[in-house]
Amino acid sequence: YFNAAIKIDPRDYRAHHNMGNLFVEINDYQKALQSFTNAFDCDNNFLDSKKRMGEVYQWMYQENYDQTNLKKSEECFLEILEKKPDDVSSLTLLALVKLWEGDIDESESLLQKVHKHQYENQENLNKNIARILSNKKLLATLIKHEYEQLTHIDNDIDEIRNPKFTKEYYDKLKKYAERIKNNSLEGNDISIDFMKNILKPLYNKAPKNIKKNLINTKIDISNIESKYNQIQPEIVVIDDFLTDEALRDIQKYCRNANIFKYPYEFGYVGAFLTKGMSNKFFLKLSEDMRLTYGNIFKKHKLTQAWIFKYDNQKIGTKVHADQASINVNFWIAPNDSNLDSESGGLVIWNKLPPKNWKFSDYNSVSAASKINEFLESENVDKITIPHKENRCVIFNSKLFHKTDDFSFKNSYIHRRINVTLLFD
C-alpha cells in the first residue's frame, strides 16, 4: 500500500514515514532508516521522522554497541531540539544518550527540563489534572500520600528546612484527607488551582554523597554474578545491596522528596526517571550498579527507573512483565515495618510473554486476569522472594512478576517502598 502511494507521489513524506514504521516492526533497521531519511528529505519540518531515526540508531546501538550509532542518535535529537527546544521525548532520549556516554551532569540537566515540563506546561498539566479528577481512586491516593508526607515534613523529624507550603494549603489537604476516610470526597469538590499546587513539587533535594560507590562491595560479588549467569531463568537475590550511607540517604529522600505525583488505583504513588528522579544520585546509582556487577549487566544501560510507595492497607503491583533485558528491584522500608518477614517481596514466574503478545497484553492493569489465566493454564512454576530491608532482586525483566501480598505497619514512615531500574 505505501509502496503504491510512493509510486504515485515520491514526495509523499507520510507514506515514507509509515513504511519506516513497518520496517521497525520487523526489526529491519537499515530499511527503516532509509524510509525515515526519505520522509525527512521530502519535508524537513516533519520532525517525527528525524526522531524515529534517532530512536532506530539507539536500538542499533543496543544491538551492537557501536558508538557511531550512539553519536548519530545524538545528532538527530540535537537537530530536533534546535527547531523545537521543548520537545519532551527528544530531551528524554538525548538524556539517555548522554548517560550512556557517561555524561551524568548533562543527562541530569536534560531530565530536569523534562520534569519541569510535567508541571509547568499547561497542556500537559491539564491532561494530568483531568485524569486524576475523573477517577475517585486516583484522587484519594494522591491526596492521602500528600497529606501524610507534608505532615511528616512539618513535624521536622528529618530536619527538612523551609518547606514551600502554606498553612492554608495544608489545612485544605487535611480536610480532604478526612473526607477520604468517610468516602465523601468527589472530583468536583477540588479546584483546578488546588490540583496545580498538589502536582507541583515542593521539595526535591537529592542526596549529595555520591563521590563513593553507592553499591556495597564488601560482599561476594563474583559469586553473585556467577549465580545470575548460571541459573535459568536469570534471578539472583542480593542482601545488603547498598552501602549503609546510601541506604539511609535514599530512605530519607523517599520520605521527604515531594515528587510522588503519579497515583495508581490500587493505592500506590510513583515517581519516575523523568518525573522526579531526575538527579545525579539516581543516575550515579544506576552506573554504580552496572559497573559493580559488570558480569551481569555487561553492556546493558539504564532505560527507565521508578519508585513506588504503597498504601499498607491496599495491594501491590499486579502481575506483568517489563520490556527490558534486566530488572533491578530493591526494597528500602525498614525491617520493623514488615509484620510478616516471610512475605511482602516479589513473586516471579518462570515464563516470558508469548511472542505474539503486544506490550499492552503483558504490561497493563487490565491484562492481569488474562495473564493469570495463561500462567495457570500453563502450570508455570514461580518463586516468592520475601521482603527485606536493603534486599535487591536482579532478574530477566521479561519474566512475569508481581508484588507479593504484604502486611506492613499502617503509618507513613512504614510504607512499603520499592525502587526499580530497567536496563537494556
Q: PLM features: residue spans?
A:
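Helix-start (N-cap) detector for alpha-helical repeat units in TPR-like alpha-solenoids
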Residues: Y13-R14, L47-D48, V88-S89
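Fe(II)/2-oxoglutarate oxygenase catalytic core
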Residues: W100-G102, S107-E108, Q112-C392, K398-D424
